[in-house]
């Protein structure tokens, strides 16, 4: 398709541009798309034919085109199709495999100390969101009216439906 042809051109360009960078340890196709397709209720949320198309298109891109292009352009560096590449919530039996995200503190409101127990081989995402430093906030908010979690400006900058509640929890 024209879309995949365009993606291939972008892949080649970016792989060649980035493959010599010392910080590129592995290539990753996406962040949490497979996780969402499998575990976030999308199979129930969308009609069966739409959900099946999601998977078909996912496979074509992340299990097909991207790794095929990487084999040609950067064959020695590993590729994972989605991050995390282990099961959600950092199950202990998965901790020695691949890389992991652990949302137990953020989404599950577990105490920070749980991170001493949930120690995967490679954790690429964990922790709790926060607001930016005050100098950054001052670029979009006025101190006299907007420096309140409930102000319209602060709500517009909070992208998580549970964000402010979790921040206040901790």
At which residue positions do the language-model features occur?
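Active-site neighborhood of glycoside hydrolase catalytic domains
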Residues: 2-93
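Substrate-binding clefts and catalytic carboxylate motifs of secreted carbohydrate-active enzymes
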Residues: 27, 34, 61, 65-71, ...
């Amino acid at each position: 398709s024209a879309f995949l042809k365009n993606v291939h051109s972008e892949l080649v360009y970016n792989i060649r541009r980035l493959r010599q960078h010392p910080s590129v340890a592995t290539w990753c196709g996406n962040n949490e798309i497979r996780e969402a397709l499998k575990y976030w209720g999308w199979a129930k949320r969308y009609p069966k034919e739409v959900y099946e198309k999601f998977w078909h298109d996912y496979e074509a891109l992340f299990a097909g085109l991207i790794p095929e292009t990487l084999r040609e352009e950067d064959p020695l560096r590993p590729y994972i199709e989605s991050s995390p590449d282990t099961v959600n919530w950092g199950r202990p039996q998965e901790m020695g495999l691949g890389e992991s995200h652990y949302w137990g503190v953020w989404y599950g409101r577990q105490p920070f100390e749980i991170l001493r127990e949930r120690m995967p081989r490679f954790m690429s995402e964990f922790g709790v969101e926060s607001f930016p430093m005050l100098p950054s906030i001052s670029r979009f908010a006025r101190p006299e009216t907007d420096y309140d979690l409930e102000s319209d400006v602060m709500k517009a900058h909070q992208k998580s439906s549970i964000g402010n509640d979790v921040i206040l929890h901790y």
